[in-house]
Amino acid sequence: SPPCCTNQNIRRPDVAYLTPELVAQFGNLATLPQSFPLIAEIVSPTDIAEDVFLKAQEYLESSCQEVWLVFPESRLIFVMTQNQILTFRSGDTASTQQILLGFSIDVDRLLA
């Protein structure tokens, strides 16, 4: 993903979704002047969980509507919005809550 601006930093999410409206508005810019509406961060075993959750909160405080934190080693996905955190594990089907409504994927398939 290209970089985006949060209220605090310039960040480069692992995976991000940009709505067609935002593509039309900002598509040619090298750095998005706001957070993406949907962001996924792939968490490595060396990442500090507290830092990962703080980064997700930073995105959510900067116009992002939904953040997926993907923990491949523990086979967990946390889907965070402004008012909830959902946990999906092996055997579950993770689904979007705010953006790309109707998108879902089996956790095991995503982490295969």
What residue spans do the PLM features occupy?
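C-terminal interaction segment
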Residues: 1-62, 66-112
